[in-house]
């Protein structure tokens, strides 16, 4: 992979003979006559500088790690989603932690793991806010997910709804 003059994330091996392809058939999502082998994602070490909460168009609050910028597979990574509060707790990610970062599927920045450092002084564990960081409305919880109750009064939700409405997938 590293010796190639271009970026690839894996290799697809397939049967070329159409009569064999026809005999092998299809699975629900892919042909039985082809298989993809993905390389393990590249990983680099960096530091969590902060954890902020973003508000999506549906009001879902998502913790995001702000990272010391690091290059992973030709792309500079400075942010990575932490998905939800349960995932942050499971991985025990805190501000100041040394972490291993990867691009999941060679695309999406993700924290693969925390790297313990001998004698480190760790920050307090991350907690989701009680109020929306954008509009100040109270925050509700549904299983692992936290959400803003502000609906159309929340600037982030309103902006996201307008962007979604005007997108190719919605307005079309």
Where are these regions (language model features)?
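RNA/tRNA-interacting regions in translation and RNA-turnover enzymes
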Residues: 1-172
């Amino acid at each position: 992979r590293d010796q190639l003059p271009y970026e690839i994330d894996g290799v697809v091996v397939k049967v070329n003979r159409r009569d064999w392809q026809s005999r092998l058939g299809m699975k629900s999502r892919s042909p039985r006559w082809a298989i993809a082998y993905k390389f393990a994602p590249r990983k680099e070490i960096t530091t969590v500088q902060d954890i902020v909460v973003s508000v999506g168009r549906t009001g879902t609050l998502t913790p995001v790690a702000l990272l010391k910028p690091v290059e992973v597979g030709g792309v500079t990574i400075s942010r990575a989603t932490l998905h939800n509060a349960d995932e942050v707790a499971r991985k025990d990610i805190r501000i100041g932690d040394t972490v291993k970062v990867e691009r999941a599927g060679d695309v999406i920045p993700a924290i693969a793991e925390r790297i313990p450092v001998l004698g480190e002084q760790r920050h307090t564990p991350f907690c989701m806010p009680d109020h929306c960081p954008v509009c100040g409305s109270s925050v509700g919880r549904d299983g692992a997910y936290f959400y803003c109750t502000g609906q159309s009064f929340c600037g982030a939700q309103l902006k996201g709804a307008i962007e979604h409405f005007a997108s190719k997938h919605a307005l079309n």
